[in-house]
Amino acid sequence: MAEISPADVKKLREKTGAGMMECKNALVSSDGDFDKAEKLLKEKGLAALEKRAGRATNNGKVFIKMKGDNSAAVLVELNAETDFVARNPEFIALGEAIAANALEKDLNAPNDELNGLVQDLATKIRENMGLKRLCQVKASSNEYLTQYIHGDGNIGVVVKCESDKPEIFKNEEVKSFVFSLALHIAAFNPIAIDRDKIDQAWLKEQEGIFRVQMEQDEKLKGKQEKVLEGILKGKVTKYLSEICLLEQGYVKDEKITVAKALEECGKKTGAKLTVTGYVYYRVGAE
């Protein structure tokens, strides 16, 4: 039997939100296999399904730098050990400089030069720091980018929209609407734009978890298979509506979906408006 360390239990608890003893028991039952233990907790209903990014365990900030013509944007996550350092003016200046450097040099990932800048400041401040991730989002001539930083920089979003009449992106009302989409994504962190973008193998696994939970539900004992399949289908449909951007209730009016809000905005301008991509960064998330 594999030895279960307190660090393993802590890591599983941070990932799933389940209790310490439940996590330890799951690791023991799975002989130390982290993925199996996580799945076991889900099947027992002790861990939330993956609707949101992992719980943040690091301090730091998300930085975004965008070109003046909104044709490209860079997102950066810079981490530190403490919130005190994450609020340090030198730390903030470094994050902004990294984002600007990456945008200027057309980078899409950290490199030795940027990591060296981080280590220089870490040595000066005497606290461990790290450039966790960096990416660039680009827009075509018929697309438009906007950004949103939440709070003190713990969440950052860049959203990309497309239109058959790209001149509408000069319209202030449309710009405001696209910004509200970025705000929505920051608030609800959808896993995908729509159902077609969901990985089917991953969805099959979630369906399997629902099946196990239903088998353990005393209220469903003795139900006909046809009835159970209907319940399962309903659970999957509800789950998809919670994790797919276009099916979520729009942040400014939850009576309508994001898809409907896009349609209504398009009608006002006489153009078709679609979301073609987005990037969501949360400090400490995997």
Label for each model-derived stretch:
Residues 2-286:
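N-terminal assembly/interaction segments in proteins that build large macromolecular machines
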